[in-house]
Amino acid sequence: MDFSAIDWQRPWLAHLRDLGAQLATSPDWIAAASALASERGLTNSTHLPIVFVPQDLLPTSIGYEAHIHATGQVPTRHNLHDFFNALIWLHFPATKRMLNQLQAREIHRHPSRNLRGEQRDAATLFDENAAIFVSRKPSMTTLLAQRQWNTLLLADATRFHAECQVILFGHALLEKLIQPYKSITAHVWPLHFHDLESEDRGQLSLPLLDEVVATMVAPGFVSRDFHHLPILGVPGWWQGQDEAFYADASVFRPPKMTQA
Protein backbone atom coordinates (compact mmCIF):
# COMPACT_ATOMS: atom_id res chain seq x y z
CA MET A 1 0.00 0.00 0.00
CA ASP A 2 1.50 3.29 -1.15
CA PHE A 3 0.78 6.32 1.02
CA SER A 4 3.12 8.49 -1.04
CA ALA A 5 0.20 9.31 -3.34
CA ILE A 6 -1.35 11.40 -0.54
CA ASP A 7 -0.24 15.03 -0.55
CA TRP A 8 -0.97 16.07 3.03
CA GLN A 9 -0.44 19.72 2.12
CA ARG A 10 -3.65 19.80 0.10
CA PRO A 11 -5.98 22.32 1.76
CA TRP A 12 -8.89 19.88 1.87
CA LEU A 13 -6.85 17.56 4.11
CA ALA A 14 -6.08 20.18 6.76
CA HIS A 15 -8.45 18.70 9.36
CA LEU A 16 -7.02 15.20 8.86
CA ARG A 17 -3.37 16.05 8.29
CA ASP A 18 -1.76 15.51 11.68
CA LEU A 19 -3.34 12.19 12.55
CA GLY A 20 -3.42 10.97 8.95
CA ALA A 21 0.29 11.56 8.37
CA GLN A 22 1.05 9.85 11.68
CA LEU A 23 -1.10 6.83 10.86
CA ALA A 24 0.41 6.53 7.39
CA THR A 25 3.89 6.00 8.88
CA SER A 26 2.78 3.07 11.04
CA PRO A 27 4.05 -0.37 9.97
CA ASP A 28 0.54 -1.72 10.67
CA TRP A 29 -1.88 1.16 10.20
CA ILE A 30 -4.99 -0.98 10.79
CA ALA A 31 -3.75 -2.04 14.23
CA ALA A 32 -2.64 1.53 14.92
CA ALA A 33 -6.10 2.83 14.00
CA SER A 34 -7.69 0.30 16.36
CA ALA A 35 -5.35 1.39 19.16
CA LEU A 36 -6.32 5.03 18.61
CA ALA A 37 -10.01 4.09 18.55
CA SER A 38 -9.56 2.32 21.89
CA GLU A 39 -7.69 5.27 23.40
CA ARG A 40 -10.50 7.60 22.35
CA GLY A 41 -13.25 5.30 23.56
CA LEU A 42 -14.92 4.90 20.17
CA THR A 43 -18.03 2.73 20.19
CA ASN A 44 -20.89 1.85 17.90
CA SER A 45 -24.50 2.68 18.78
CA THR A 46 -24.81 -0.47 20.93
CA HIS A 47 -21.75 0.62 22.96
CA LEU A 48 -19.43 -2.02 21.54
CA PRO A 49 -15.85 -0.81 20.98
CA ILE A 50 -14.88 0.08 17.42
CA VAL A 51 -12.10 -2.19 16.16
CA PHE A 52 -10.68 -2.18 12.63
CA VAL A 53 -10.27 -5.78 11.47
CA PRO A 54 -9.17 -7.49 8.24
CA GLN A 55 -11.86 -7.62 5.56
CA ASP A 56 -11.79 -11.42 5.43
CA LEU A 57 -13.27 -11.53 8.95
CA LEU A 58 -16.58 -10.27 7.54
CA PRO A 59 -18.92 -13.30 7.38
CA THR A 60 -20.62 -13.90 4.06
CA SER A 61 -23.96 -14.19 5.85
CA ILE A 62 -24.09 -10.56 6.97
CA GLY A 63 -23.63 -7.18 5.30
CA TYR A 64 -20.90 -4.67 6.10
CA GLU A 65 -23.02 -2.12 7.98
CA ALA A 66 -24.99 -4.78 9.86
CA HIS A 67 -21.73 -6.39 10.98
CA ILE A 68 -20.40 -3.09 12.37
CA HIS A 69 -23.66 -2.57 14.24
CA ALA A 70 -23.69 -6.11 15.64
CA THR A 71 -20.02 -6.41 16.60
CA GLY A 72 -18.25 -3.03 16.52
CA GLN A 73 -15.79 -4.55 14.05
CA VAL A 74 -15.10 -2.45 10.94
CA PRO A 75 -13.89 -4.74 8.11
CA THR A 76 -10.89 -2.99 6.60
CA ARG A 77 -8.79 -3.60 3.51
CA HIS A 78 -5.24 -2.43 2.91
CA ASN A 79 -6.20 0.32 0.49
CA LEU A 80 -6.58 4.09 0.56
CA HIS A 81 -10.37 3.94 0.48
CA ASP A 82 -10.50 2.09 3.79
CA PHE A 83 -7.62 4.11 5.21
CA PHE A 84 -9.66 7.27 4.80
CA ASN A 85 -12.69 5.50 6.25
CA ALA A 86 -10.72 4.70 9.41
CA LEU A 87 -9.45 8.27 9.54
CA ILE A 88 -13.00 9.62 9.39
CA TRP A 89 -14.08 7.23 12.16
CA LEU A 90 -11.30 8.67 14.31
CA HIS A 91 -12.28 12.29 13.61
CA PHE A 92 -16.08 12.02 13.40
CA PRO A 93 -17.04 9.06 15.60
CA ALA A 94 -20.49 10.38 16.56
CA THR A 95 -21.56 10.98 12.97
CA LYS A 96 -20.15 7.66 11.76
CA ARG A 97 -21.92 5.90 14.63
CA MET A 98 -25.22 7.57 13.77
CA LEU A 99 -24.92 6.77 10.05
CA ASN A 100 -24.28 3.13 10.93
CA GLN A 101 -27.27 3.15 13.26
CA LEU A 102 -29.49 4.54 10.48
CA GLN A 103 -28.25 1.82 8.13
CA ALA A 104 -28.85 -0.90 10.73
CA ARG A 105 -32.34 0.39 11.44
CA GLU A 106 -33.26 0.30 7.75
CA ILE A 107 -31.72 -3.16 7.31
CA HIS A 108 -33.89 -4.38 10.20
CA ARG A 109 -36.98 -2.87 8.59
CA HIS A 110 -36.17 -4.19 5.13
CA PRO A 111 -33.94 -7.30 5.48
CA SER A 112 -33.81 -8.00 1.74
CA ARG A 113 -30.44 -7.06 0.27
CA ASN A 114 -32.28 -6.11 -2.91
CA LEU A 115 -34.29 -3.37 -1.18
CA ARG A 116 -32.27 -0.44 0.12
CA GLY A 117 -34.67 2.49 0.25
CA GLU A 118 -34.14 6.26 0.32
CA GLN A 119 -32.67 6.42 3.81
CA ARG A 120 -29.96 3.84 3.19
CA ASP A 121 -29.08 5.46 -0.12
CA ALA A 122 -28.81 8.87 1.54
CA ALA A 123 -26.74 7.52 4.44
CA THR A 124 -24.37 5.88 1.96
CA LEU A 125 -24.03 9.14 0.01
CA PHE A 126 -23.16 10.96 3.23
CA ASP A 127 -20.67 8.31 4.29
CA GLU A 128 -18.95 8.13 0.93
CA ASN A 129 -19.19 11.61 -0.57
CA ALA A 130 -20.28 14.27 1.93
CA ALA A 131 -18.73 17.62 2.65
CA ILE A 132 -19.94 19.81 5.50
CA PHE A 133 -20.54 23.44 4.55
CA VAL A 134 -20.34 25.66 7.63
CA SER A 135 -21.45 29.24 7.06
CA ARG A 136 -21.59 32.28 9.31
CA LYS A 137 -24.41 33.80 7.24
CA PRO A 138 -27.50 32.03 5.88
CA SER A 139 -27.07 34.01 2.68
CA MET A 140 -23.98 31.96 1.80
CA THR A 141 -25.94 28.72 2.06
CA THR A 142 -28.65 30.28 -0.10
CA LEU A 143 -26.07 31.09 -2.76
CA LEU A 144 -24.90 27.47 -2.65
CA ALA A 145 -28.44 26.14 -2.94
CA GLN A 146 -29.16 28.48 -5.85
CA ARG A 147 -25.87 27.61 -7.58
CA GLN A 148 -24.80 31.24 -7.72
CA TRP A 149 -21.21 30.18 -8.28
CA ASN A 150 -19.70 33.52 -9.23
CA THR A 151 -21.14 35.33 -6.23
CA LEU A 152 -20.32 32.51 -3.82
CA LEU A 153 -16.90 31.39 -5.05
CA LEU A 154 -15.39 33.85 -7.52
CA ALA A 155 -16.30 37.36 -6.45
CA ASP A 156 -14.42 37.53 -3.14
CA ALA A 157 -12.26 34.66 -1.91
CA THR A 158 -11.38 36.51 1.28
CA ARG A 159 -15.05 36.93 2.12
CA PHE A 160 -15.74 33.27 1.37
CA HIS A 161 -13.10 32.03 3.81
CA ALA A 162 -14.19 34.56 6.43
CA GLU A 163 -17.78 33.39 6.26
CA CYS A 164 -17.58 29.73 5.19
CA GLN A 165 -15.64 26.57 5.87
CA VAL A 166 -15.80 23.34 3.89
CA ILE A 167 -14.87 20.17 5.79
CA LEU A 168 -14.63 16.93 3.84
CA PHE A 169 -16.23 13.84 5.37
CA GLY A 170 -16.81 11.24 2.65
CA HIS A 171 -13.97 8.74 2.45
CA ALA A 172 -14.60 7.97 -1.23
CA LEU A 173 -14.49 11.71 -1.90
CA LEU A 174 -11.14 11.93 -0.13
CA GLU A 175 -9.84 8.99 -2.14
CA LYS A 176 -10.89 10.59 -5.44
CA LEU A 177 -9.06 13.78 -4.49
CA ILE A 178 -5.74 11.94 -4.35
CA GLN A 179 -5.76 12.49 -8.12
CA PRO A 180 -7.86 15.65 -8.37
CA TYR A 181 -9.96 16.53 -11.39
CA LYS A 182 -12.26 19.47 -11.87
CA SER A 183 -15.62 17.70 -11.89
CA ILE A 184 -15.31 15.99 -8.47
CA THR A 185 -18.52 17.04 -6.75
CA ALA A 186 -19.50 16.59 -3.12
CA HIS A 187 -22.90 16.06 -1.56
CA VAL A 188 -22.97 19.02 0.79
CA TRP A 189 -24.57 19.13 4.23
CA PRO A 190 -25.09 22.77 5.31
CA LEU A 191 -25.13 24.17 8.83
CA HIS A 192 -24.56 27.50 10.55
CA PHE A 193 -21.44 28.45 12.45
CA HIS A 194 -23.24 29.87 15.49
CA ASP A 195 -24.09 26.30 16.56
CA LEU A 196 -20.41 25.35 16.60
CA GLU A 197 -18.51 28.05 18.45
CA SER A 198 -16.11 26.69 21.02
CA GLU A 199 -15.00 28.44 24.18
CA ASP A 200 -12.37 30.18 22.07
CA ARG A 201 -14.71 32.58 20.36
CA GLY A 202 -14.74 32.29 16.61
CA GLN A 203 -12.91 28.95 16.44
CA LEU A 204 -14.56 25.93 14.91
CA SER A 205 -14.45 22.87 17.15
CA LEU A 206 -14.23 19.63 15.17
CA PRO A 207 -15.56 17.45 18.03
CA LEU A 208 -18.50 19.82 18.45
CA LEU A 209 -19.08 19.78 14.70
CA ASP A 210 -19.20 15.98 14.87
CA GLU A 211 -21.78 16.01 17.66
CA VAL A 212 -23.95 18.61 15.94
CA VAL A 213 -23.95 16.79 12.59
CA ALA A 214 -24.74 13.48 14.31
CA THR A 215 -27.72 15.12 16.00
CA MET A 216 -28.89 16.63 12.72
CA VAL A 217 -28.85 13.34 10.80
CA ALA A 218 -30.35 11.27 13.63
CA PRO A 219 -34.02 11.75 12.63
CA GLY A 220 -33.20 10.53 9.13
CA PHE A 221 -32.78 12.30 5.81
CA VAL A 222 -32.94 11.70 2.06
CA SER A 223 -30.65 12.55 -0.83
CA ARG A 224 -32.73 15.64 -1.68
CA ASP A 225 -31.48 17.21 1.56
CA PHE A 226 -28.00 17.66 0.08
CA HIS A 227 -26.67 20.54 -1.97
CA HIS A 228 -23.88 19.98 -4.50
CA LEU A 229 -20.48 21.62 -4.72
CA PRO A 230 -17.63 20.97 -7.17
CA ILE A 231 -14.90 20.72 -4.55
CA LEU A 232 -12.08 22.23 -6.58
CA GLY A 233 -14.18 25.37 -6.89
CA VAL A 234 -13.57 26.24 -3.23
CA PRO A 235 -11.43 29.40 -3.43
CA GLY A 236 -7.74 28.58 -3.21
CA TRP A 237 -8.24 24.83 -3.56
CA TRP A 238 -7.18 24.70 -7.23
CA GLN A 239 -5.30 26.69 -9.78
CA GLY A 240 -6.78 28.87 -12.52
CA GLN A 241 -9.98 29.80 -10.71
CA ASP A 242 -10.96 32.57 -13.11
CA GLU A 243 -14.26 33.41 -14.81
CA ALA A 244 -13.73 30.75 -17.46
CA PHE A 245 -13.12 28.12 -14.76
CA TYR A 246 -16.47 28.77 -13.10
CA ALA A 247 -18.25 29.28 -16.44
CA ASP A 248 -17.83 25.58 -17.25
CA ALA A 249 -21.50 24.57 -17.03
CA SER A 250 -20.66 20.87 -17.30
CA VAL A 251 -19.13 21.16 -13.81
CA PHE A 252 -20.70 24.24 -12.24
CA ARG A 253 -24.27 23.50 -13.15
CA PRO A 254 -26.51 26.52 -13.70
CA PRO A 255 -29.48 27.19 -11.42
CA LYS A 256 -32.48 24.99 -12.01
CA MET A 257 -35.17 26.64 -14.07
CA THR A 258 -38.44 27.02 -12.23
CA GLN A 259 -41.74 26.75 -14.01
CA ALA A 260 -44.02 29.75 -13.91
Predicted regions span which residues?
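Short, glycine/acidic-rich hinge or "gate" loops at secondary-structure transitions
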Residues: 97-109
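A contiguous, surface-oriented mixed alpha/beta subdomain in the mid-to-C-terminal portion of proteins
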Residues: 108-260
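Eukaryotic complex-assembly regions enriched in large gene-expression and RNA-handling proteins
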Residues: 62, 97-100, 121-123
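Long, hydrophobic/aromatic-enriched structural stretches that serve as scaffold segments
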Residues: 42-92
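N-terminal ordered "arm"
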Residues: 1-49
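Short, hydrophobic/amphipathic alpha-helical patches that form generic packing surfaces
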Residues: 10-19, 82-94, 124-128
